[in-house]
Amino acid sequence: MSRRPALAAFAGVFVVTMLGLLAVGATLPVLPRYVRGPIGSTDLAVGIVSGAFAVTGLAFRPLAGHIADNRGRRIAVVAGALTSAVAGVLYFVPAGVPGLIVARLFLGAGEGMVFTAGSAWVVDLAPPDRRGRLIGLYGLAIWSGLSLGPPIGELILHASSFEMVWAFAAGAPLLGAAIALRIPERFTPAAAGRDRGPLVARESLLPGFTLSLGVVGFAAVSAFLVLLLDERGIGHGAATFAAFAATVVLVRLLGGDLPDRIGPVPCAIGASLVEALGLALIATASGPAAAIAGAMVMGGAYSTLYPSLALIVVGQVPEERRGVALGTFTAFFDLGVGLGSPLVGAAAAISGYEAAFWVAVACALGAAVIARTGLTRTRS
């Protein structure tokens, strides 16, 4: 595929993924109000409903990779987008909290399929010397959807009703499925009846575990940044988090080719060490300037870590196993957030908010050690 059609195909996959994440983001500020309001349930129910999608997201990523390798990237992305649209339709069903949990389980499965198969599709489109950059840019579809989705959901709710939010949550991924059907696919799936290996790729385990340790810092920032700054009387928590998010985007846009230019393993080591530094700056911040600086350092490192590790994964497997490898790898992101959030929460409960960030520092340093020892060996 020549350069221009490949760029058009990349843009299409990006838009499809962003539409799916817009549906996820639009419901984030709306579902808690719906559970506490019209349904009249508890805060515990809010937590269960909100987090249910992570269960199937984790489980379906390797399966999505398997489908992408054996049936094609497009069919896996379309199936995932349609599954996400079903989730939006299920929000309309008046089945209380159990019905919402089922809807969120469908959403997790759909989102997991779209991002996993989409990642493999993007790598198929990328020249070998630009894979790291395109992997990083593709990840911005997640940030775009989760950043723009919540205000869209709020706007729809205030202008209309819960039902219109559900309609948007169904319509956005449905539009994505229609777009995906028109994107050309270069990859040739396995012949009928031929299985391309197990659901879990062993080559992804060590990079995936490194990623899990690295995303503990994201869990700490997401849960306790604002609370830590408020506790110290610093405030500006929203601005500090915005600085973190903006740096993630800027580094992906301006420095997204670092893994391609200097190598994914050195980038992964450096990103882990710099992430630890940023988290330490946040933990010791005594004013807004120090907190924002720490958040920006953390954001720059966090932005580089994922594409570096993903590039290691795709470099170790043949094209026909790329989907399974990326499915296994991306599942470790969910695992890291799923286990890292209660880990830093326990640290905060026992020793205060600052302790949550020191635990994340230790995890980031652990990621650097693994990248320096284990990943260096696998690349040699």
Q: Predicted segments — roles?
A:
Residues A103-I142, L311:
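Cytoplasmic helix-loop-helix junction between adjacent transmembrane helices
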Residues G40, G72, V93-P98, G263, ...:
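Helix-breaking motifs and short loop linkers at transmembrane-helix boundaries and internal kinks
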Residues L82-A95, V274-S286:
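C-terminal ends and interior cores of transmembrane alpha-helices
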Residues Y138-L181:
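Helix-loop-helix hairpin linking two adjacent transmembrane segments in secondary transporters
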